[in-house]
Amino acid sequence: MCSSDLERIQLNEDTLWAGGPYNPANPEAKGALPEIRRLLAEGQNQAAQALVQQKFLAVPRTQMPYQTVGDLLITMSGGAVAENYRRELDLDTAVARTELQVGSVRQVREVFASVPDQAILVRLSATGGTLAFTLSFASPQRSTFRTEGGNMLVLSGQNGDSAGIKGALKFECRAVVTATGGQVTADDHQLHVSGASSVTIAVAAATSYRRYDDVSGDPAALTRQSLAALQGKPFDDLRRRAVEEHQRLFRRVALDLGHNAAAEKLPTDERVLQSATTEDPGLAALYFQYGRYLLLGSSRPGTQPANLQGLWNDSLDRKSTRLNSSH
């Protein structure tokens, strides 16, 4: 979601699931197996099925749900009406961009997730004026918020319980702000930026997950390490590295199904609506490339497998994320 005065960046970390390590084996299954076999041999299939349901299935019967870290909120000051508002996602660069005009000030906001640097980068810039905003975290998890060092925002939390399995994962998300011009100040749980011509926000998240039976990791150390590795690197270099890594895979495939020049000039939402009554073969190609973009962003070597939502989820218990083997 994005508006002229609020930028919401929804945050996920692909190892943040509910619950903790557990053994799903039903302790009654072995003892019930001879009776199940006997019933099946005698043709009593329904009775055998009932016994399977009662004593043979995993405990709990459901998988744990994938969960959200929360949101990074950029609340702009001033409240003036925005004009010339434009949002876009460039599939070729994997950069989301927002442009708008607030009075005499033109604002540009860019957001991308960097595979090589394992961070989300946000760049806000202004011409004809300066930027002023408040940066904060929000989360439905059991969490706390604080600031560190005058320019860093920290979200620390614990995952939730599910189906009788206690939450055992700790997680942390950090956002560090670098401003050109102006100043950055902090209160207990927010950062405030004023008078800046441009601002870079680097976001890193981690959990205590190490493997399926080990959640003893140190998410605080991991996030500090990720952000420390970015120090001193110009934003343009970080952007270039992220784009090159994305294009290394994305540009391996091209698909041309034909074109409708008039349809291709429309905003994507209008183009989708019009496609029901208008021949637009290029829209199918766009969907194809969008799917590739999503998969490149949610499944890489060393990551968790993508679930039915890739890795994007703003809920604590969205049922479709339980089907994590579907991809």
Residue ranges and their predicted role:
Residues 2-322:
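Aromatic-residue-lined binding/catalytic grooves and analogous aromatic/hydrophobic interfacial grooves
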Residues 323-327:
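Short "domain-exit" segments at the C-terminal end of structured domains
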